[in-house]
């Protein structure tokens, strides 16, 4: 899939995320929008994960450690055909499997998450199992930056480098906001590159809302032999809608009718602009 097609998918995904959160009157809007492009590129270009390979022992594994942003994951899994898009309209409704954090009851989800700090330890275990079993699969996990205050992240990181897990890809959604404010005000996170490098990771930076940059970076995996891979993905919380971007209130704010209509209008305008850019480029 080329970068223009990926960019169009990101816009479509954001529309779905807003729609299902509005319908459920619940959800984590900002963090779902910040990681949309990451999940888009992983599932559509990088990982060997599909409904057809769901039971293959050599499929890649994905663990969504920042489980509160599950609306983004549900949206991508529906698009990939793990379940019908219409099922997402039951989000957070009584009796639905589509609850506010990932569970293995939903097709395509490998691990229950939501208790922050647990996704990376599980991903490390999966990657170690692949090494011990002689399997070729890779393990990907996306963490929130606020999640890095959890001690289990650093315990797991020691293990990842000790066991030389170059089949592990850890992505930090570095949007600099968490539920109560700026990450730096809650717990200092300066020098993240140096910290992760000291724990033995091969660290790379990327614009986490640029599908082309993400595609180029993931094509370089593994970054260094015998080292776990760490991607500091610099993102904007609420990416794609001007009045949602970089606003702490949108951590789990549900859009009003007017906000929803305005957000969809902005995304549709972005769609038109992208289409116009693509047509202009093709005519040169």
Stretches with model-predicted labels:
Residues 17-20, 32-162:
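Cofactor-binding active-site loop characterized by glycine-rich and histidine/acidic residues
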Residues 71, 148-149, 177-178, 237-242:
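Short, active-site-adjacent cap segments at secondary-structure transitions
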């Amino acid at each position: 899939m080329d970068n223009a097609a990926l960019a169009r998918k990101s816009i479509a995904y954001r529309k779905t995320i807003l729609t299902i959160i509005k319908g459920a009157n619940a959800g984590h809007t900002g963090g779902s929008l910040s990681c949309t492009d990451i999940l888009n590129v992983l599932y559509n270009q990088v990982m060997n994960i599909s409904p057809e390979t769901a039971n293959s022992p050599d499929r890649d594994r994905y663990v969504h450690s920042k489980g509160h942003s599950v609306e983004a994951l549900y949206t991508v899994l529906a698009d990939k055909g793990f379940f019908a898009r219409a099922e997402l309209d039951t989000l957070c409704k009584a009796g639905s499997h589509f609850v506010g954090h990932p569970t293995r009851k939903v097709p395509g989800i490998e691990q229950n998450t939501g208790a922050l700090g647990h996704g990376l330890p599980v991903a490390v275990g999966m990657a170690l199992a692949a090494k011990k079993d002689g399997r070729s699969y890779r393990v990907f996990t996306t963490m929130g930056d606020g999640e890095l205050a959890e001690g289990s992240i650093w315990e797991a990181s020691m293990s990842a480098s000790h066991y030389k897990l170059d089949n592990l890809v850890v992505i930090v959604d570095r949007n600099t906001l968490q539920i109560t404010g700026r990450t730096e005000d809650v717990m200092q996170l300066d020098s993240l590159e140096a910290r992760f490098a000291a724990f033995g990771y091969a660290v790379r930076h990327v614009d986490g809302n640029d599908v082309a940059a993400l595609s180029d970076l993931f094509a370089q995996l593994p970054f260094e032999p015998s080292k776990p891979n760490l991607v500091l993905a610099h993102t904007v919380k609420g990416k794609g809608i001007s009045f949602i971007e970089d606003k702490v209130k949108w951590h789990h704010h549900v859009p009003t009718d007017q906000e929803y209509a305005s957000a969809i209008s902005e995304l549709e305008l972005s769609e038109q602009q992208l289409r116009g850019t693509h047509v202009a480029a093709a005519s040169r």
